């Protein structure tokens, strides 16, 4: 029956329970449902407008035999129920009796928890159960003991199902990822055994019309196996969570329902021909769904129970269709710079000739429209690949190399060869300019040379540090310089006295100083340096000239002293770069004042001025870096910023933008698997958010090899459930592993990597459990 003619009388119903149920089962007439849980064992009648409680088998009993993991209803007798309890007890119930007599039989033969129980499809007295002890028991309710025991050679049997196609065949799935087929008459050995999943298999279900077996596992996959002859994988469905239950949809060959054990609370119906998105979803539950069942042959009614203590009767017409809300287009950027784009192909009817374009033909075309369930898997898409033209970038390597390879090689080459620390800035710029030139990045080469010219030979400090060096004479550096000048003052005084007596300096690069007032001599006749100034050497003067104090240099003289000085003496300045553009005055000796005013700051003539520009390049450099990022070269923009060191504080670039550059460049390095280079960039970052990237996703969660439980304790290899450290031992030699540990994600066993290399050179299965480990 197609989806377009669903039963519109079917509605969604909900009922709250006293406790959450672990399993559900329907009777042969599909008008009653049995619910079993840790504190729940009831039977409800299914009505058109809800559920009605008809039997409570637990009552006030607190026996663990009533704490059930699974429940099964006989397919031939509506009065017979079976439950599998957490203490390993398998109970048979007769609903036609009263009180305690309802518990017809109690089989206490399993040594550990019983996970599943099911009745034979054609024999009303036969049922089988699977347990954590790795055994399968076959019971005849006419006997008080099991009639057969099947040893699965695994740690736990999670589900068993009778085949609807062969009377004596049943399947069993285990926590070691294997699937077994057994003949009830041959208890000593299974017929077929194969590894279906790389993790525990929790559920299985036979297809009602085809010889297909569906399995669900912790690896978040649903697999459909063709059991005709040798088992073969037909379809695989990838889900987002661990699969807990699967049920084939009646009257729909390719539809199967599933629910998850964790994370995902919804019930999904999948079309195995389009496995990447559910055909329909039921999202009513607010906690993990623990059981699902179709109401007999009605493909539009689904029953589900959950840990939210509710039971739902879902109408298929109320299900959501994820495919209708999904984006039918997708795009991805490749590592070579190409772009892949996929979009849905719209189905258009072929154009017909004018003669045939009649009302009758259009009527026929409308009648042949396919149903929604059929159209779902017929949807298909087309993918396009867009390549970037060679003229897009200004970084060509050679005309013989294709554009994607150029960008790929230049990025990787620069990432590996660019140096961002460990040398002087001038050396870094020179090296990185050569690397950029080598890979044809001419704009980057120019930028590196510019950085070398303006930042490599000059020392830039924050503005407040520059101003304090001249305005605050109490600065420790200036105090040391004043002490040095005071110690050399007598010698300088003698030299200056000789110059003022008429001796002409031999060279034009010597220092001229104004006549010193007699007040600078103390009463004791001892000469002291001027208290209002500090005499600096030429080297010190040059090192002090920066952009912020450049205005202190006037006409070739640098003034050191109180800024409020009303008068300064001017002497003939020597020819240099700063005063070359100013007119020179020929001053005679008579024009000089014979005695300077008291407390006049010393005026020193600078013989050489460094080639510092009269403008600051910081804004220009920041604009250049932003432009490099805008054209897609975030590699150059960020490496320049890192190489600048403390000078980057002078650039007016927002930290949020720099953080975005870091994330972008690190992501690009990860795309090319340049892990070491990405780590170095992260370590050189001065932003806390970027520095913490190396601390993310460094933990590898493991499971116990004995019980399969995740290890989340404080001690690394100690299992809180098993109370042992068996997982820390090598499965080959049996000794505790110290150092490199090789671990199988499928069976959770491992050991010394050297021992496993030798073992798997000759074997293919795990030495401890027989799991088919994918060792490489």
From Swiss-Prot:
WD repeat ranges per the UniProt record: 63-103, 109-149, 152-192, 196-235, 238-280, 284-326
Region (Disordered): 466-490
Annotated Pfam families: WD40
Annotated binding of Zn(2+) 4, by residue: 749, 766, 769
Top-rank lineage group of the source organism: Eukaryota
Zinc finger (RING-type): 728-776
E.C. designation(s): 2.3.2.27
Effect of loss of the gene: No effect on viability. Decreased mTORC1 complex activity. Decreased body size and weight. Mutant females have small ovaries, reduced egg chamber growth and exhibit a 90% reduction in eggs laid per day. Activation of autophagy and accumulation of autolysosomes independent of nutritional status.
Main subcellular location: other
Family to which the UniProt record says this protein belongs: Belongs to the WD repeat WDR24 family.
Protein name: GATOR2 complex protein Wdr24
Organism of derivation: Drosophila melanogaster (Fruit fly)
